[in-house]
Amino acid sequence: MEMQMSNSDRYRIEHDSMGDLRVPIDALWGAQTQRAIENFPISGRSMPQGFIHALGFIKAAAAKVNAELGLLPKSMAKEIEAAALDVAAGRYDAEFPVDIYQTGSGTSSNMNANEVIATLAMRATKGPIHPNDHVNLGQSSNDVVPTAIRISATLAVQGRLLPALKHLRKMINKRARGLGSVVKTGRTHLMDAMPLTFAQEFGAWSAQIVSAEARLNDTLKRLHRLPLGGTAIGTGINTDPHFGRNAVKVLSALTGIHFESANNKFEGLAAQDDLVELSGQFNTLAVALMKIANDLRWMNAGPLAGLGEIELPALQPGSSIMPGKVNPVIPEAVVMVASQVIGHHTAVTVAGQSGNFQLNVTLPLIAYNLLESATLLGNVVMLLADKVIVGLKVRQDRVQEVLERNPILVTALNPIIGYEKAAVIAKRAYKEHRPVLEVACEESNLNPVELARLLDPAALTEGGIHVVGGGGG
C-alpha cells in the first residue's frame, strides 16, 4: 500500500496491485477498500459491527502469534495488535463502509480491516506496515471470514440472545406463579375447549423458551470450531503449521469463550452447515415467539367485542382517527421480527448451499442475516418480557363469565352419561345461552351437588377421569 498526496485537499492517492486510486483524505482505509466501495454501491448497508469487531480480534491474535513464531518483528506486532484491539472495541466502526453485497468470500471486508489496522499501526510506529504482508500474515480471507462469522455469532448469542431468553422465561414463570389459581377456558381450533389455568398456559410458553435455549446452546458447540489456519482452501498454505491452533487459543483468551481449532479446515471453508443450523434455531425460536405473541393478541382482543381475557399495558395511542384505541404494539412487533427472521433463514439456507468445491461464496450474506437475526431476537425478547409479560392484567370477571357458560365442560360427563347424551347437553346449552350446569341438571339423573363437583373447572384442570362419588383418577 503506497500513498501519495493529490493536488486536491479532499483526496490522497493510494496504490495497490491494480494501480493508483483516489481515497478520501481522512479515511483510514486504502485502495482495496476504496475499490470495493466503488464496485458495490448496492444496499447502503455495511457489515454488522459484531463481525467487524471479530475481525479485530482475529488480527490481534494473528499479530501476537506471528511474533511468537518469529515471523513478525515484535515491535511491529505490538502496534498491529493494539490497533486491532481498538477495532475490536468498536472505536473505528465508521471506517468499515463496504457493502454487505460484495465479493462472496468477504475479501473486501477482510482487506478493509487489514488496511485500517495497518494505517493505525503505522501512525504509532512511523514505519511501513503492509496490510497484506504484515496484518494479513499467515491468513486468507477464506479462513478469516468464516472464523469471524463464528466468533461474532457466538458472542451475539451468548452475550445478548441467551440472557434475553432467560429473562423472558423468568418473567413468564413469575407471572405463572402469581396466576396459578386462575382458571380459564382453553381453546383448540380457536374454539372453546376444556379449561386450564393461566399457569398451565404460561407454562407451555416457558417450556418453549427452555427448549429454544437448549437448542441454541447445543448448536454453539459446533460454532466453537474455528477454521483459522486453513488459509486459501484448507491446506494451510503460506502459514506456520502452529499458527491456527495458537491463534485460536489467543482468541479464546480475548473473547472469554472456549474456541477450538477445527479438525477439518476444509469443511470450515467450503461448508457452512453449522451456521445454517444456527439460523435454523433462530427460525425455530421465531416460530415460538410468533405463537406466544399471537396468543397474547387473541387473549387481549376486544376489549368488548373480543376475548378480552387479559389487558396488555397501554404503551401508545393506537389510532390516528379512533380516539381511545390502544393496540398490542409489542406483540405485533414480535410477529414482524419473527417474520423477518424466518425470511433471513431462507436466505441463509440458500447461501449455505453455495459452497462450490473448496469455498462458500456467500459469506457476507450469511454473516449479515445471522447477526441481524440474533440482534432482532435479543432486542424483541427483552421488550416482550418487560413491556408485556410483566405488566399484563387478567380480567378475572370476564374470564369467569365465559368459563361458567362453556358447554364443553360437559366433556367431563362422558364416562358417566356417554358421549351422545353429553353432546345433547352441550348443544342445548349453546342454543339457549345457559350455563352447562343448569342444562345438565335437567337432562341427566345426577343431582346438582354431584354435577357441580363433576363440572368444577378447577378440578378439571387436573385431568384424570371424574366419576360419580369420587375425584379425578
UniProtKB/Swiss-Prot annotation:
Q: How does it assemble?
A: Homotetramer.
InterPro entries, alphabetized? Fum_hydII, Fumarase/histidase_N, Fumarase_C_C, Fumarate_lyase_CS, Fumarate_lyase_fam, Fumarate_lyase_N, L-Aspartase-like
Q: Which domain of life is it from?
A: Bacteria
Q: What is this protein called?
A: Fumarate hydratase class II
Q: What is its EC number?
A: 4.2.1.2
Query: What protein family is recorded?
Result: Belongs to the class-II fumarase/aspartase family. Fumarase subfamily.
Q: Spell out the molecular function terms from Gene Ontology.
A: fumarate hydratase activity
Q: Which CDD domains match?
A: Fumarase_classII
Q: Which UniProt keywords apply?
A: Cytoplasm, Lyase, Tricarboxylic acid cycle
Where is it located? Cytoplasm
Q: One GO cellular component from the entry?
A: cytoplasm
Task: Please give the organism.
Answer: Xylella fastidiosa (strain Temecula1 / ATCC 700964)
